[in-house]
Amino acid sequence: MLKALVNEARLRLDITTKGPLLVKTGYATVIGADMAPVMTYHNGQQEVYIPGSSLKGVFRSHIEKVVNSIKPRVACNPLSEREDARDDRHLYRPSCSSGFKKDMPTQAVYAASCPTCRLFGSTSYIGRIVVEDAYLPAKAYEEKKLIEHRDGIAIDRLTGGTGGGAKFDLEVVTEGTTFTTDIHLRNFEIWQLGMLFVIIQDMQDELIRIGSGRSRGLGKVKASIRGQDEGSQQGGVVLSTTRAYKSKEPDKELWGLGRWLADEGEDEKTYGTRRTDLLTLPQEVAHVPSGIRNVRVFNGETLDKLKEQSIESFVIQIEQWTDAPQITTQRR
């Protein structure tokens, strides 16, 4: 079933810098600043952007902390092995992938994965979420100065003064610059939608920083879900289902993957989902045929209620999370 398309969610996220931002290139420069922002060719020119991989990494790292704050040892440390997770043993469980067999079927991998691996993926499983690169709007460079030069110095740990020959310089993206990214969920459970909304809410509250120098005041951003675009892009959160399925999702309900699987006769234990994976909406949101999909758009009050209900589902899911069966055969 995970190789079929059951349900989808997509949204456009505007990310505005509330201070200087530096997502470094990761390689040394022969000329110019010691630290420079990553660049790409877009809008017909070289310009700064935020890689989708950087955003996805920040999102995952943040939600791992949130999950394990609600209930310790629910989210795994994806970089640890089962035998070397000593430092995080009290809070994180070992990496999910470290215990999977090479030929393990997808449904078993999904069922045995922790919440963050189910959404973001692992070396054994691709995950449910896609985060695109965040780009500047067209003609952004013509409207304002986007890059500023800064100087920095290293501090001598003994004297507290300036370290000799330790001056460095950096180029940062200026405050008030807006980047836009698209986020796409497919075959999601309701609590996974809530997990995404928790991340977006914390970005709206300016609690998540991006890039380098976060402890030195860099990387503060604020995010918001884009409303209706001037073009064909639908605003708010767009949820859709595939019209080919014989099951019909009522206009006053939102079905997650578990409910769709149950309606197709799949055993709950196969994927570790629940047949009760659905929301009863406070008001009907109509399905509108669009190609092979039935589309629903959540905006304004309907979006606020969707956030509230799905976040509540996320919290309950984590509080009730039980460990997956122990897997003893290591990946070959």
Residue ranges with predicted function:
Residues 1-332:
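Small/polar/charged residue-enriched interaction surfaces, especially the RNA/DNA-contacting tracks
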